[in-house]
């Protein structure tokens, strides 16, 4: 046979190079983040509603005390109660404003996460078109390099990633030939040269 390894085995190894696990994990993390964010938002809203109810009850109690103070015609106590009521009202208004701002921020963050999730779902587990093309190109290159290596040819790349050197081993003779690949010669020329060197 021309190949040292069974083609089916080579193809099986090539399939193993496809890795969609990071994309699946990213989708899972986003879903978990959305769920956690929703739970956190609901908890904050419940806490805020509980706090507002407590403050409302307290305000009602203070209003009752204020009415009693007015009925008793105690002007000094009345003035003090009014100051306290104004302070409580200010705190309640401030707390309500902060809760509203936080709610808007959480809603905005939730929308961003939903958009991100929609983008990932639209791309699918294989990623977007550019990612798929790059992976397919890399997989084809890896397959070719494995085939060359099985034939006794190691292709070496320079710092720029260009394959410009081939090391050809003739196992029958124990020879090793190093060939610098020049773009001015055709692929057909190098194919014939490699083949004759391996068979020579």
Swiss-Prot record:
<dbReference type="InterPro" id="IPR038066">
    <property type="entry name" value="Spc24_Fungi_globular_sf"/>
</dbReference>
<comment type="subunit">
    <text>Component of the NDC80 complex, which consists of ndc80, nuf2, spc24 and spc25.</text>
</comment>
<keyword id="KW-0175">Coiled coil</keyword>
<keyword id="KW-0963">Cytoplasm</keyword>
<dbReference type="InterPro" id="IPR013252">
    <property type="entry name" value="Ndc80_Spc24"/>
</dbReference>
<dbReference type="GO" id="GO:0031134">
    <property type="term" value="P:sister chromatid biorientation"/>
</dbReference>
<dbReference type="GO" id="GO:0005816">
    <property type="term" value="C:spindle pole body"/>
</dbReference>
<comment type="similarity">
    <text>Belongs to the SPC24 family.</text>
</comment>
<dbReference type="GO" id="GO:0005737">
    <property type="term" value="C:cytoplasm"/>
</dbReference>
<keyword id="KW-0158">Chromosome</keyword>
<dbReference type="GO" id="GO:0051301">
    <property type="term" value="P:cell division"/>
</dbReference>
<keyword id="KW-0498">Mitosis</keyword>
<feature type="coiled-coil region">
    <location>
        <begin position="42"/>
        <end position="129"/>
    </location>
</feature>
<keyword id="KW-0995">Kinetochore</keyword>
<dbReference type="GO" id="GO:0005634">
    <property type="term" value="C:nucleus"/>
</dbReference>
<keyword id="KW-0206">Cytoskeleton</keyword>
<keyword id="KW-0132">Cell division</keyword>
<protein>
    <recommendedName>
        <fullName>Probable kinetochore protein spc24</fullName>
    </recommendedName>
</protein>
<dbReference type="Pfam" id="PF08286">
    <property type="entry name" value="Spc24"/>
</dbReference>
<comment type="function">
    <text>Acts as a component of the essential kinetochore-associated NDC80 complex, which is required for chromosome segregation and spindle checkpoint activity.</text>
</comment>
<dbReference type="GO" id="GO:0008017">
    <property type="term" value="F:microtubule binding"/>
</dbReference>
<dbReference type="GO" id="GO:0031262">
    <property type="term" value="C:Ndc80 complex"/>
</dbReference>
<keyword id="KW-0539">Nucleus</keyword>
<keyword id="KW-0131">Cell cycle</keyword>
<keyword id="KW-0137">Centromere</keyword>
